[in-house]
Curated annotation (Swiss-Prot):
Keyword terms: Endoplasmic reticulum, Heme, Iron, Membrane, Metal-binding, Microsome, Monooxygenase, Oxidoreductase
Membrane topology category: Peripheral membrane protein
List of residues binding heme: C439
Recorded name of the encoding gene: CYP2A7
GO CC, alphabetical: cytoplasm; endoplasmic reticulum membrane; intracellular membrane-bounded organelle
Reactions performed catalytically: an organic molecule + reduced [NADPH--hemoprotein reductase] + O2 = an alcohol + oxidized [NADPH--hemoprotein reductase] + H2O + H(+)
Family, per entry: Belongs to the cytochrome P450 family.
Cellular compartment(s): Endoplasmic reticulum membrane; Microsome membrane
InterPro entries, per database record: Cyt_P450 (IPR001128), Cyt_P450_CS (IPR017972), Cyt_P450_E_grp-I (IPR002401), Cyt_P450_E_grp-I_CYP2A-like (IPR008067), Cyt_P450_sf (IPR036396), Cytochrome_P450_fam2 (IPR050182)
Organism domain of life: Eukaryota
Protein name in the entry: Cytochrome P450 2A7
Length: 494
């Protein structure tokens, strides 16, 4: 009995010492790192966070500590940037220092620092330069990709017409369409909409994004070193990631067998050719692992973000039928009903442009951006960030900055219209991030959003099974990604 009592006292004493040391270390660095709540050993600020609403939970600290503060997500120390000014100062004014890539534990399980999106240093530089050039070679930013999107829009319209106005879940109708655009670039061809393997891949991607946006997904972000060895939903997420990697490996093997060095058919071919050209370069980053991970980067990013934005957009238009009516009026006046929309039409369609921008602003699909990391010891404002410090630029806080958007919690296309009804840009429109590690697929995504939205709205009216006042447009999850609520709808021919 005495021994157990002494053991308990010893444990309490050790815990007290650890807490006091944590407080001392925090105060010692206060003159350097931004301020923030005092962390506990290992668990950090976990007890002060609501993992169901992690973004809002993190943002609340700004009320006490200001727009730049430090939190501890378990053992991870992260500097958080809130609001337009802080985010722009870091990502644009000090772009080079803040251009490192931070941790994204779920995706890091498969990427492990390889591939264009999650790499750092010379690897990131080489792969990014190649990816941008290769996408351009396959038509991105040119008329070629616009024709590809228009063709895919036609397939989408046919698929929707085949529902004959029935109540449907639009999720996979939209993700099939969007994914086929990037698939035509990275794999050289589109998938049939009924292809079972294709539908399985889309389901895997959706499942991964949904996991990262759950409470368990956020726990994994904090305690991945422990949780990756334990049973739980994270193991299912790993299986989904492995399934996607296996699919990419199969595609790469096929291209290796059929490769014509003089006639690349897709992104994989182009990378394989570059691997051959660089095989004697000891510093090359062009090898099989980076090929597979870069291809997987493009496939996932080119599918989920745009399709989620479309899904959120149709829900918002059903919630606001007066906006849908104005969209229809502008389409009929500028394009009519007898020709396909073109990307250049957007210059004559300020209201449609404003609606799409407001959908992106309100939807806020990647609210915390991908984590950044400072590449060297960095002075930021009055603070000192040691080399390697992780940084969360809270894009959602910029998209809802009241200095730029009146009533930022409301969906209102007027946020992007001037007094004359003309489209107006905003420095706080940052859904693709800004600076050196912004989304290099931004141009493709903008074109897809305009052409897909406009083509669907040209052909259909949207009908919900609920009255507009009963439609809930609050997100299902807001963590790594913003996931809209599940819903069904009807597309009625116009």
């Amino acid at each position: 009995m005495l021994a157990s009592g002494l053991l308990l006292v010893a444990l309490l004493a050790c815990l007290t010492v650890m807490v006091l040391m944590s407080v001392w270390q925090q105060r010692k660095s206060r003159g350097k790192l931004p301020p923030g709540p005092t962390p506990l050993p290992f668990i950090g600020n976990y007890l002060q966070l609501n993992t169901e609403h992690i973004c809002d939970s993190i943002m609340k600290f700004s009320e006490c500590y200001g727009p730049v503060f430090t939190i501890h997500l378990g053992p991870r120390r992260v500097v958080v940037l809130c609001g337009h000014d802080a985010v722009r100062e870091a990502l644009v004014d000090q772009a080079e220092e803040f251009s490192g890539r931070g941790e994204q534990a779920t995706f890091d399980w498969v990427f492990k620092g390889y591939g264009v999106a999650f790499s750092n240093g010379e690897r990131a530089k080489q792969l990014l330069r190649f990816a941008i050039a290769t996408l351009r070679d396959f038509g991105v930013g040119k008329r070629g990709i616009e024709e590809r999107i228009q063709e895919e829009s036609g397939f989408l319209i046919e698929a929707i017409r085949s529902t004959h106005g029935a109540n449907i879940d639009p999720t996979f109708f939209l993700s099939r369409t969007v994914s086929n655009v990037i698939s035509s670039i990275v794999f050289g061809d589109r998938f049939d909409y009924e292809d079972k393997e294709f539908l399985s891949l889309l389901s895997m991607m959706l499942g991964i994004f949904q996991f990262t946006s759950t409470s368990t997904g956020q726990l994994y972000e904090m305690f991945s070193s422990v949780m990756k060895h334990l049973p739980g939903p994270q193991q299912q997420a790993f299986k989904l990631l492995q399934g996607l990697e296996d699919f990419i490996a199969k595609k790469v093997e096929h291209n290796q067998r059929t490769l014509d060095p003089n006639s690349p058919q897709d992104f994989i071919d182009s990378f394989l050719i570059h691997m051959q050209e660089e095989e004697k370069n000891p510093n090359t980053e062009f090898y099989l692992k980076n090929l597979m991970m870069s291809t997987l980067n493009l496939f996932i990013a080119g599918t989920e973000t745009v399709s989620t934005t479309l899904r959120y957009g149709f829900l918002l238009l059903m919630k606001h039928p007066e906006v849908e009516a104005k969209v229809h009026e502008e389409i009929d006046r500028v394009i009519g009903k007898n020709r396909q929309p073109k990307f250049e039409d957007r210059t004559k369609m300020p209201y449609m442009e404003a609606v799409i921008h407001e959908i992106q602003r309100f939807g806020d699909v990647i609210p915390m951006s991908l984590a950044r990391r400072v590449k060297k010891d960095t002075k930021f404002r009055d603070f000192f960030l040691p080399k390697g410090t992780e940084v969360f630029p809270m894009l959602g806080s910029v998209l809802r900055d009241p200095s730029f958007f009146s009533n930022p919690q409301d969906f209102n296309p007027q946020h992007f219209l001037d007094d004359k009804g003309q489209f107006k840009k905003s420095d706080a429109f940052v859904p693709f991030s800004i600076g050196k590690r912004n989304c290099f697929g931004e141009g493709l995504a903008r074109m897809e959003l305009f052409l897909f939205f406009t083509t669907v709205m040209q052909n259909f009216r949207l009908k919900s099974s609920q009255s507009p006042k009963d439609i809930d447009v609050s997100p299902k999850h807001v963590v790594f990604a913003t996931i809209p609520r599940n819903y069904t709808m009807s597309f009625l021919p116009r």
